[in-house]
Amino acid sequence: SVSKAPVMFVMGNHDKPYDAETYNGCICIEDQIRTFRGIRILGLGGSMRYHPDAANQYTEKEMRRRIGRLRWKLKRNKGFDILVSHAPAAGIHDLEDLPHRGFACFCELIETYQPKLFVHGHVHANYGTGFQRVDQVGETMVVNAYDHYILEFPEG
């Protein structure tokens, strides 16, 4: 990476578990809150479960449980500034089919903590729907980072 910032990521629905060497210096923030330059970043990878035995796929109930296990981290960090997920939130950039449906519990996270930014992927521009890249939900800018999306933050 040519960036001076760390490269952080979450797992997608087709990703397999890797060993630390495979990350090649990148940081998996799955189920963590990482702080960089005072910015608190929460990571929740995976998608809605559409295949019974697949890794990184979750029912709504399973994703809620993951978030519930983070409650002490959320409290200790006084919330978060950026949510990074693979899947979208329900009703925001998602599709009606089960594999591309968003999580309602992400909407609740946004409503409760009002992060400045929610970055997700999973819904590709070439799916033929009315692809929406950026939305605003209350105080939260929602970005579908499919393929790539460049966000610049001021120094400091």
Which role does the model predict for each range below?
Residues 10-20, 49-53, 89-93, 116-135, ...:
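Active-site environment of divalent metal-dependent phosphoester hydrolases
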Residues 13-105:
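Conserved catalytic scaffold of divalent metal-dependent phosphoesterases
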Residues 12, 41, 83, 118, ...:
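Divalent metal-coordination and catalytic microenvironments
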Residues 1-36, 111-112, 139, 143-148:
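Core catalytic region of metal-dependent phosphoesterases/phosphodiesterases
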Residues 34-38, 58, 107-113, 117, ...:
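Binuclear metal-dependent phosphoesterase catalytic core
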